[in-house]
């Protein structure tokens, strides 16, 4: 998934935690998360944000700019949201640190639904699973992606993430059959083969280090390695194209990051100057964006044409029964091109592929990065993970069946997604007047919201809510094995792993929407099982061969919130062969 964002860039302050208190330093960021926002990381095992149900800070008088912003909001949009609690978006609060951290503070003060007032605009922020379920599942087609679609459309076109409802229904119906069981089974070998290249590269570097200096430890930016790995996997599994970025530099990945950065930039301006055609050639960054987009589009267009030239049209059922273990081209592109009864439109295929390229690449690289970060601070959990790896895999590569037995590794992946959700916010906009439920401790009659209201579902808040999680800031993969009662919370069914028998991972059904690692409802991420399996295989193969620790302290790792949450200066780690 890719997060949405909007509004001006400003100064933010990298944060670190001392004794549960938040302290600040300075860098640059954009308000809503696409443009880099930097904070120093949290040592999840030793420190956490102190939980408060109401603000204990005395109210202070805002400056002139703050007060003007609040008055303007109340005049123009405050009345339309009735008595909903209001978090007044002072300039200092909104631009002083990444938005999702401010949203968490206001959630603890105002509850599971509140209005974020900012200038002439007001946003509804949801941090309650009861309300999230209402929006994402029970009334899913009363909302579209709003500002997310506006920003991503120049890049992803009518792909699944930014698509309007009518287009989304058509494309979802076409793409969903491609993620069938035999395809996923075949992809485990792709995950394994690509991960093996990363492993062999690291082993070669260790041998060279031993030869040159006698040392058996190397230092690697694992975030960069995971980024290359994720690109190679997406290339082979979606396009049947080998980027080879684990072993060489890829111009395509540079272009991908260039397009993402432009999306970040567009979130920082009130005035969309890029919509004026001359800006494409006058403004240097817009010229670069057009160049990056052309590189990616040329690559995708070539792949689409190659696939169509060898098209073997057949029914969906027969496509799903192909021998994917021996198929030369088992990619999603091949499936979509060969599917009978589907109008093959090059532009729509390009949009679908671009969406999968960017969303799939970003999410996996971020999950693996933060998995290493959290595990490196918990050596006992590394030992437990390696014991499972040894028992299930031995020295061999994962298969589909053995991957399913790596239960603890999968729990690590989902716990990483709980603490570092990708993205931290889901964006929706009402298509008609709606009445949102009040949620836990909220108004019984709920809240009326008008058509066109922008809604932020804070996945970060849901995943760290003290009302629905025990020790919400701690890294505890084992938590997903336990049942949690609703504890009298009306409208929430609690956490019960048996609610979704056979599920590959704890999902929104098991947690009744308190856990949304891949969203929920009809517009849930279509590649959830793919992403979980990919991360499980890569993580297992890394710790099968190596012992890993951070190069510096956890506090030295700075967090950047862009399309996903990643490390500002990479995730530098020390690797050496496992000592058994």
UniProtKB/Swiss-Prot annotation:
Gene3D superfamilies: Cytochrome P450. Its EC number is 1.14.-.-. GO terms for molecular function: heme binding; iron ion binding; monooxygenase activity; oxidoreductase activity, acting on paired donors, with incorporation or reduction of molecular oxygen. It comes from the Eukaryota. CDD domains: CYP97. Heme binds at residue 525. Its main location: plastid. InterPro entries: Cyt_P450 (IPR001128), Cyt_P450_CS (IPR017972), Cyt_P450_E_grp-I (IPR002401), Cyt_P450_sf (IPR036396), Cytochrome_P450_Monoox (IPR050196). Keywords: Carotenoid biosynthesis, Chloroplast, Heme, Iron, Membrane, Metal-binding, Monooxygenase, Oxidoreductase, Plastid, Transit peptide. Heme-containing cytochrome P450 probably involved in the biosynthesis of xanthophylls. Hydroxylates beta-rings of alpha-carotene. May also have activity on beta-rings of beta-carotene. This is Cytochrome P450 97B3, chloroplastic. It comes from Arabidopsis thaliana (Mouse-ear cress).
């Amino acid at each position: 998934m890719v997060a949405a964002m909007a509004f001006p860039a400003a100064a933010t302050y990298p944060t670190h935690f001392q004794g549960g208190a938040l302290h600040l330093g300075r860098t640059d960021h954009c308000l809503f998360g696409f443009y880099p926002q930097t904070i120093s990381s949290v040592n999840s095992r030793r420190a956490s944000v102190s939980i408060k149900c109401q603000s204990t800070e005395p109210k202070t008088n805002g400056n002139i700019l703050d007060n003007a912003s609040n008055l303007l909001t109340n005049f123009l949009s405050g009345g339309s949201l009735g008595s909903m609690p209001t978090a007044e978006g002072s300039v200092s609060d909104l631009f002083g640190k990444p938005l999702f951290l401010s949203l968490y503070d206001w959630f603890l003060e105002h509850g599971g639904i509140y209005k974020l007032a900012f200038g002439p605009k007001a946003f509804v922020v949801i941090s309650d699973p009861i309300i999230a379920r209402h929006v994402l599942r029970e009334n899913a087609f009363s909302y579209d992606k709003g500002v997310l679609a506006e920003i991503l459309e120049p890049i992803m076109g009518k792909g699944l993430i930014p698509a309007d409802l009518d287009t989304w229904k058509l494309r979802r119906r076409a793409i969903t059959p491609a993620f069938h069981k035999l395809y996923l089974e075949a992809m485990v070998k792709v995950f394994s083969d690509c991960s093996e290249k990363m492993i062999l590269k690291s082993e070669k570097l260790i041998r060279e280090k031993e030869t040159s200096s006698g040392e058996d430890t190397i230092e690697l930016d694992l975030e960069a390695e995971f980024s290359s790995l994720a690109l190679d996997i997406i290339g082979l599994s979606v396009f049947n194209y080998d980027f080879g970025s684990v072993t060489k530099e890829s111009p395509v990945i540079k272009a991908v990051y260039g397009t993402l950065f432009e999306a970040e930039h567009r979130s920082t301006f009130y005035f969309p100057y890029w919509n004026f055609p001359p800006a494409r050639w006058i403004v240097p960054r817009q010229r670069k964006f057009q160049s990056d987009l052309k590189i990616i589009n040329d690559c995708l267009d070539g792949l689409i044409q190659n696939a169509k030239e060898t098209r073997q049209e057949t029914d969906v059922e027969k496509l799903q029964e192909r021998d994917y273990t021996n198929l030369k081209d088992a990619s999603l592109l091949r499936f979509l091109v060969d599917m009978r009864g589907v109008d093959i439109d090059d532009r729509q295929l390009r949009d679908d592929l671009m969406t999968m390229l960017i969303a799939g690449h970003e999410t996996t690289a971020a999950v693996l990065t933060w998995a290493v970060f959290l595990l490196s601070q918990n050596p006992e959990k590394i030992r437990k993970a390696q014991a499972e790896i040894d028992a299930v895999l031995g020295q061999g590569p994962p298969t589909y069946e053995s991957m399913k037995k790596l239960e603890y590794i999968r729990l690590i992946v989902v716990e990483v997604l709980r603490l570092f959700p990708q993205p931290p916010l889901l964006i929706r906009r009402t298509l008609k007047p709606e009445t949102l439920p009040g949620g836990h401790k909220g108004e019984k009659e709920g809240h009326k919201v008008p058509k066109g209201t922008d809604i932020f579902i804070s996945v970060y808040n849901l995943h760290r809510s003290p009302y629905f999680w025990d020790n919400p800031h701690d890294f505890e993969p084992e938590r997903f094995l336990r049942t949690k009662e609703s504890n009298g919370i009306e409208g929430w069914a609690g956490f019960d792993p048996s609610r979704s028998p056979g599920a590959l991972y704890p999902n929104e059904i098991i947690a009744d929407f308190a856990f949304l690692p891949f969203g929920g409802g009809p517009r849930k991420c279509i590649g959830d099982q793919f992403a979980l399996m990919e991360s499980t295989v890569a993580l297992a193969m890394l710790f099968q061969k190596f012992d890993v620790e951070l190069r510096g302290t956890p506090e030295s790792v700075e967090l950047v919130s862009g399309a996903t949450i990643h490390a500002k200066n990479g995730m530098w780690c020390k690797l050496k062969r496992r000592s058994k």
